[in-house]
Amino acid sequence: MNTFAQAQFMTDVNGRPVKELKYTDIDGSPYLREDWSAGLIKTQSGKLQQFARVRYDAFQDELEYDQAGKYFRLAPEISEFSCGDGTFRNGFPVIDNHTKDSFYQILYDGKTKVLKKIMIRVITEKAYGSATETKRFLKEEKLYLAINGILQAIKGDKKAIILIFQDKKEALETFIKNQKLKLSSEDDLLKVAEKYDSL
């Protein structure tokens, strides 16, 4: 048990013990969205299962479901899930501090994939002139491109993004110029990925 969570042992759908984590002394929420929503999960074997109430714990990078008022963590055999926050998938190459089990939100799902990694971490703060420390959850997001089985982090400037698409650089530069894309928004990036797949 860590210093900021109390664990209760429960059983998941496969009969294995799992921990329901209750964060007691941290401000904010570990969930991407506090509300529950209907969800659909896909296992590694391709089996689909629907749940009436799920939510994504981005701090633990796990999906939680509610069954008759009891909370359960879904087993690691899950490869994909969809809920009110979008569609999330794992199985991508290891990058940064993320593993093959890490879930990414799928923003564009063509031959090229645009992914968003949503991370929630705990930070400790001390108010000026105070000896008291407080902990709170902080949400961070990072965009990635998956091209030909390679995962690459997306940096904010146009030149760095064009370098990722180097094999079709000239056509994309023309497209970006004609469309007046600044590549500073997710929408612009999705348009470029879609164009890349069409070339």
Predicted feature locations:
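Bacterial Sec-dependent N-terminal signal peptides
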Residues: M1-F9, V192
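A short, solvent-exposed beta-edge/loop patch
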Residues: V122-K191
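Short acidic/polar alpha-helix capping motifs at helix-coil junctions
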Residues: N2-A5, I26, R136-K139
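Positively charged
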Residues: Q6-Q44, Q50
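Short, solvent-exposed mixed-charge patches
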Residues: S198-L199
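Aromatic-patch recognition
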Residues: P30-L32, G39-A153
